[in-house]
Amino acid sequence: MHEKKNTAKRRSALRIMGSLIGLVKPLLHIMMAAIILGTMGYLCAIFLTILAGQVIVHGLLTGAAGTSLSVQNMWLVHTPVKTILTVMIVIAVLRGILHYAEQYCNHFIAFKLLAIIRHKVFAALRKLCPAKLEGRDKGNLISIITTDIELLEVFYAHTISPIAIAALTSLIMVCFIGRYHVLTGLLALTAYLTVSVVIPMWNGKRGSQKGMEFRTGFGELNSFVLDSLRGLDETIQYGQGEKRKEQMSGRSKELTSVQENLSRMEGSQRSVTNMVILLASFGMLALTIYLYTKGGIGFEGVLTCTIAMMGSFGPVVALSSLSNNLNQTLASGERVLSLLEEAPLVEEIPGDAASGGDHAFAGAEAQNVTFAYEDETILDQYSLKLEPGKITGIHGASGSGKSTILKLLMRFWDVQTGRVSVDGADVREIPTKYLRDMESYVTQETHLFHDSIANNIAIAKPGATREEIMEAAKKASIHDFIMTLPNGYDTEVGELGDTLSGGEKQRIGIARAFLHDASMILLDEPTSNLDSLNEGIILKSLKESAEEKTIVLVSHRVSTMNVADVVYEMENGRIS
């Protein structure tokens, strides 16, 4: 199957941010604390410079006899300089404490939420698999789970509270500067809005597409590297190393080109921001001097408004700078949200067990089943009856639909028409957990985790004793081999079980099925990688277990069918 390309309409930045902010709800009280602490911290930094200006005015008024300075709103005129300096020291210390506390709260929220999001993503993947994940680009999924989620730290630690802090601080400063004259307040408001809203929106609009291109390209590069590592032996064997190297170099250059474009946008945005700050600062100076000459404000207003304007851009500059990284962050957020919101093809049925209590397993049946992968019909009006206590063989060539019927019995997919029932009930009505407990499924390719052999077998039964694991391994004809290893059952199998042969991995998979001890065992080509001796041992174990279990044996080998009580021949999705 081929992965479908995502043709869904892109979300707006505000919609992405709204969805991400919605996840903060459990930690809203900490977010409010971060906003208050951050606002107070910035105000401390701003008023530190304003107080310094007041000291200058104070000195001019008290130490420059004969000066003709006009003072209208000198709020610290009667305060001793020593007191002002003491307040400045206290404010400077508070600034550091408040900034630390704000950052602590923000990062606590960020890392707590990243853990929650990872949990949600893995839960979503579990619901989507295998129907929605078969054929999906695994490198891109890894990129979403790792780097995309990690990038959300920028949003939660350095975006949400800075937006609120910038808004609150700007509002307070507009009121403070505006108390000298309405025009100074309007100029401050215009400058803050330009730096914190207009410039980021302009930069975000032109860079959002590039941000998504970079995150998608990064995921595709991850897939390519992963694919190259897995196929390293074949690459070397067929002399494709140079070609693979050129392909990787080409992909890296494309990604670098996108990153350079983003960097250029970042540079131009910084330049525009700095230009606006300079224009606003000198504009405030010019405006206050003009108002001073007209008697609109006093000299302290000229100095205080200019200093306040120059020193109060910190919160809005921080907000403006966010848009540089925000393009990639929001692209990552969109990819994560799309995965979380993707609807599974098969909805899980809640519950732990079917009603009716303990009873004898009633077998399984497929009745007039039609099933297709997208537009390719695999099963057409297919019927099959699996008697309890019997071994049923399904024989046919590759691509005839043998494996598909096992996946439908496991309810990895739902049928388009017809009915699949297990233990007398439609699989679409059986609680998913109970269905999984009733069935053991051994696939053609056994996946082994980077762990010990014992733990790989014990996946089928958490908490299994070593004796139970060994008994299952004996039935799967793998026990003797395991005992020849230096560490026996504690031997690490390596990544993807690369230290073991295909046949050894397959037998460990069969050992899992024996350990799971389910009422029905589904075996997809269980002996394809085995020699005739080991095939005979495993088939003998299956025959001995058949009286108490329902076994479905899928294979293209005629010899494997010899152990079956009933054999169905499959051809093009039909019984022949």
Outline where the language-model segments fall.
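ABC-type nucleotide-binding domain
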Residues: 357-576
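Membrane-integrated ABC transporters
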Residues: 1-45, 63-81, 102-106, 110, ...
